[in-house]
């Protein structure tokens, strides 16, 4: 198919138009008094949200060059959400400001590659400055304040999340579930989590959340590669007779065996999910043995002498519930013998004391935390499905922000830490166009604070000017409209979220600034037309393919 091209200033201007379209839709949600966006759904009621990444996912522009710019900024939100689960609106606002200032400099004659290097060096200095400012969580009150702020100042959500995170600690796991009852509740249950998800999206039970959730499943644990139908059929028959879902934790499942399991899910004849077994190399069998003790099953391996063809229900583990996402698996309520589990934990602790290599020590610490970790389940209810979805998004954002704060500490919030971090750039010795790149970052750092103030009904430029002259850590509280110490006022942000937002924004902005050519598929003015001389379009009135844009 023919391509359409744009070059130099024209290409960058069209890309910037898309950047602005997406960012303008997202930035009105920033801050404690940010507004909502209403998103149309092809099926069901519309979604009302102030979650940046949720809004960004829905945006697709008609003009293809502008759409490329919008998709690049969408990547900023997606990347930030993937790393820390929050800060997507801040990242989008920063990206828009950096793109605007950077393109203005390039159009004025600056060398884009040198501008890019200046941006990268400036961001590195700002991140180091933020790290120095960061302080550790002071207690449950700090947890509650972070969660409350991330949930658009909802104290009910803040209290529930702080209670859950404080209970499970750093090694525990907190998950969210929809509830039929109004309000929020927190349930504490024993659970195990590891960082491997399903190997096929066709196995999800909740397409909207892209999760596979099974209650009381049978769990096959093996370090073998399963490719043939005869390898997996005995386990399927056991699960079918018991009328229970089948979860397969294996080194690899592929070929006809995987096709059989996927087909069973698609035709709803057999519920199953396949997850790559945790661990690598020689550690995989050891981690599978940990799970076998917790779940009450056996590891099917060459060393144990049990073959896949010999499997019975006694060889399979089980649990109360298992939740599998694209990247994580959470097991709740393992049906293993508690005495054997305690003995296994004691054995691992003994191995940890004797371990001399740092990698072995870290691996054993992870395995111990996995077996002793607790899971807190936050159940979210709403009066309508629209309210439920909106509240779920806020709970998930607040939870991600709180866990990030526990992990890496906190900085002054409300855009203050970023707005005041320009002071660290004063000692950065850059010349020429690299100095211009540094100025791009310096001007962009105040943009989140400006929009937090604007959304709260204040003059953004005036607020930025005042905060720039305040002592470090003192800023603008958009909720009260007053200036003061952000930590004393409880206006704080996780350092990890702030860092991820800045780095993601700078990455995409640097790429856009150095763009000279944009290439898209040629847009058909009348797709599906059959033009005949003297007759016009012979396909007029017929169903025709829609334009890809």
Curated annotation (Swiss-Prot):
- CDD domains, sorted: GroEL
Q: Which InterPro entries match?
A: Cpn60/GroEL, Cpn60/GroEL/TCP-1, GroEL-like_apical_dom_sf, GROEL-like_equatorial_sf, TCP-1-like_intermed_sf
Q: Which UniProt keywords apply?
A: Chaperone
User: Which SUPFAM superfamilies does the annotation name?
Assistant: GroEL apical domain-like, GroEL equatorial domain-like, GroEL-intermediate domain like
Q: Which GO terms describe its biological process?
A: protein refolding
Task: List GO molecular-function terms, semicolon-separated.
Answer: ATP binding; ATP-dependent protein folding chaperone
The Swiss-Prot or TrEMBL record describes its family as follows: Belongs to the chaperonin (HSP60) family.
Summary of the function given for this chain in its UniProt record: Probably plays an essential role in the productive folding of PrmA, and thus in the formation of the active PrmABCD complex.
* Name this protein carries in UniProt: Probable chaperonin-like protein PrmG
- The gene that this protein is the product of is prmG
């Amino acid at each position: 198919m023919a391509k359409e091209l744009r070059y130099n200033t024209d290409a960058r201007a069209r890309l910037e138009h898309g950047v602005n379209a997406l960012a303008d839709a997202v930035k009105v949600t920033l801050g404690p008094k940010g507004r909502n966006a209403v998103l149309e759904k092809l099926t069901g009621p519309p979604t009302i949200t102030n979650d940046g990444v949720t809004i960004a996912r829905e945006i697709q522009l008609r003009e293809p060059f502008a759409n490329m710019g919008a998709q690049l900024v969408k990547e900023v939100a997606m990347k930030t959400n993937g790393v820390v689960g929050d800060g997507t609106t801040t990242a989008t606002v920063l990206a828009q400001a950096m793109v605007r200032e950077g393109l203005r400099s390039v159009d004025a004659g600056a060398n884009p590659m040198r501008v890019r290097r200046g941006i990268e060096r400036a961001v590195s200095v700002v991140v180091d400055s933020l790290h120095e400012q960061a302080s550790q969580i002071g207690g449950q009150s700090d947890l509650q304040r972070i969660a409350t702020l991330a949930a658009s100042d909802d104290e009910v959500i803040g209290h529930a999340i702080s209670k859950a995170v404080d209970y499970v600690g750093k090694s525990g796991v907190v998950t969210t579930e929809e509830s039929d009852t109004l309000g929020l509740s927190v349930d504490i249950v024993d659970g195990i989590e590891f960082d491997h998800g399903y190997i096929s999206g066709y196995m999800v039970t909740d397409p909207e959340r892209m999760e596979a959730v099974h209650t009381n499943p049978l769990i096959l644990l093996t370090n073998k590669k399963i490719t043939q139908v005869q390898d997996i059929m005995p386990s399927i028959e056991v699960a079918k007779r018991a009328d229970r879902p089948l979860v397969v934790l294996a080194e690899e499942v592929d070929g006809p065996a995987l096709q059989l399991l996927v087909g069973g899910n698609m035709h709803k004849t057999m519920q199953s999910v396949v997850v790559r077994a945790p661990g690598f190399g020689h550690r995989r069998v050891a981690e599978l043995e940990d799970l076998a003790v917790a779940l009450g099953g056996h590891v099917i391996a060459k060393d144990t002498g049990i073959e896949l063809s010999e499997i019975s229900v006694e060889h399979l583990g089980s649990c109360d519930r298992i939740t599998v996402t694209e990247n994580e698996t959470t097991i709740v309520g393992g049906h293993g013998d508690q005495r054997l589990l305690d003995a296994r934990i004691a054995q691992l602790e003994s191995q940890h004391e004797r371990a001399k290599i740092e990698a072995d020590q870290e691996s054993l610490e992870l395995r111990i935390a996995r077996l002793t970790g607790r899971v807190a389940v936050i159940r979210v209810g709403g009066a309508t499905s629209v309210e439920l979805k909106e509240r779920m998004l806020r709970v998930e954002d607040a939870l991600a922000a709180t866990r990030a704060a526990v992990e890496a500490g906190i900085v002054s919030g409300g855009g203050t830490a970023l707005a005041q971090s320009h002071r660290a750039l004063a000692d950065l010795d850059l010349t020429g166009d690299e100095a211009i790149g540094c100025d791009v970052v310096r001007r962009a750092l105040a943009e989140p604070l400006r929009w937090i103030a604007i959304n709260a009904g204040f003059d953004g430029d005036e607020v930025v000017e005042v905060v720039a002259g305040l002592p470090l850590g003192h800023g603008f509280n958009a909720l009260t409209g007053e200036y003061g110490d952000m930590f004393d006022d409880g206006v704080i942000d996780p350092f990890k979220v702030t860092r991820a937002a800045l780095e993601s924004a700078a990455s995409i902005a640097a790429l856009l600034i150095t763009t000279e050519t944009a290439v898209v598929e040629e847009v058909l003015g009348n797709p599906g037309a059959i033009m005949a001389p003297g007759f016009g379009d012979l396909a007029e009135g017929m169903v025709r393919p829609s334009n890809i844009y």
